[in-house]
Design a protein with these regions (language model features):
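Nucleotidyltransferase catalytic core that binds NTPs
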Residues: 1-227
């Protein structure tokens, strides 16, 4: 019997945007995931600056972004834990909770994966979940980033939807055409009074405008205030 496949997408989500959703969609399609859980970070160790929005708003924005996706949800486990948000601790927490029977697939971009050797708990963290690395055009993983034996030996093409597999955790490289957008870009546009309609979901844009997050102004969407 095939175990449930649970996709995990972590991040500061400051704010969450269509690029995050594109990455999770690509992973979900390639790995036939049964469910996707977004986990906003309280404080990412490798992030230079503090999040601009509070944990409340970042969680709310993530929840609004997936509101119309029945098999997606948002977990507050890292926000409740507070302090530094380490992937190793989060994955261990999932194993110790009700997700023990599921296969875990940790979704991340190729840029984040390139620095995985500096992660807390490396290389042991690789044994806690399958890693799904999203490669978008112009951002493929460099061959040098895969030279380490513990990475090279795990790399594998995505399994078929009906394939049941156990054993060592793998690293799946998924090529995807995700939209080129970043949270930094969105914050800069908001601070300049520019629209972000194509960069975030309508519900996310409305919440940002309502609470004046990231310097958003009242006329963010011009005269159309219905969204």
């Amino acid at each position: 019997m095939k175990r449930r496949r649970l996709g995990i997408l972590g991040g500061t989500f400051d704010p969450i945007h269509v690029g995050h959703l594109d990455a999770a969609d690509a992973a979900s399609a390639a790995l036939a995931l049964d469910e996707v859980v977004l986990i906003p970070a309280h404080d990412q160790p490798l992030r230079v600056s503090e999040p601009r929005a509070t944990v409340y708003h970042r969680f709310a924005l993530a929840a609004l972004a997936v509101e119309d996706r029945p098999h997606w949800r948002v977990s507050d486990m890292e926000l409740v834990r507070q302090g530094r948000s380490y992937t190793e601790e989060t994955l261990r927490g999932l194993h110790d909770s009700g997700w023990r029977a599921s296969q875990l697939f940790f979704i991340l971009g190729s840029d984040a994966f390139a620095g995985i050797a500096s992660w807390h708990g490396y290389p042991g963290v690789l044994d806690l979940a399958h890693f799904v690395v999203i490669e978008r055009p112009g951002a493929a993983i460099a061959e040098a980033d895969m030279r380490a034996p513990e990475l090279r030996c795990r790399t594998s093409p995505p399994p078929k939807a009906d394939e049941s597999f156990e054993g060592p955790m793998r690293i799946f490289l998924v090529h995807a055409h995700t939209r080129d957008v970043s949270s930094t870009m969105i914050r800069k546009r908001l601070a300049s009074g520019l629209p972000i309609d194509d960069l975030v979901s309508p519900r996310v844009a409305r919440h940002i405008q309502k609470h004046h997050l990231y310097g958003a102004v009242d006329n963010l969407h011009g005269e159309d205030q219905r969204i």
